[in-house]
Amino acid sequence: MLRTMLKSKIHRATVTQSDLHYVGSVTIDADLMDAADLIEGEQVTIVDIDNGNRLVTYAITGARGSGVIGINGAAAHLVHPGDLVILIAYGTMEDAEARAYQPRVVFVDADNRQVHLGADPAMVPDTAVDLMSPR
């Protein structure tokens, strides 16, 4: 049996730009893509914390160190600059791999710089004072 599992997420990133007339996708700072083990063209789900919108698109690489999180194409109607988002990638794997897999969970600051990298999707780092763990 195959299971679809959390592969990686970038938690509470701030959208820095949007371009309605771009062909689509989400532009992500290359440093964050590396931290989250994302590659260009990989499917990602965007969850907008501010308005509850969810959408599926694909990642493209932004300038390294820029902090860019850019919403492109029609998604710009749903997600806006300044919104807090969670970027999620899932992987499909066999049961044994799924049970052992360690996702990459990236927390960022207000400038979209990595402040914590972990593997527990429910863990909240000490620096995230506004968040509560479900555990």
From Swiss-Prot:
Alphabetic keyword roster: Autocatalytic cleavage, Cytoplasm, Decarboxylase, Lyase, Pantothenate biosynthesis, Pyruvate, Schiff base, Zymogen
Record: active site: S25 (schiff-base intermediate with substrate), Y58 (proton donor)
Subcellular location: Cytoplasm
BP GO annotations: alanine biosynthetic process; pantothenate biosynthetic process
Binding site for substrate: T57, G73, A74, A75
Keyword Disulfide bond included in the entry's annotation: no
Posttranslational mods: Is synthesized initially as an inactive proenzyme, which is activated by self-cleavage at a specific serine bond to produce a beta-subunit with a hydroxyl group at its C-terminus and an alpha-subunit with a pyruvoyl group at its N-terminus.
GO molecular function terms noted in the UniProt entry: aspartate 1-decarboxylase activity
EC category name: lyase
PANTHER family: ASPARTATE 1-DECARBOXYLASE
HAMAP family: PanD
Family: Belongs to the PanD family.
Record-given protein name: Aspartate 1-decarboxylase
Organism, as annotated: Mycobacterium sp. (strain KMS)
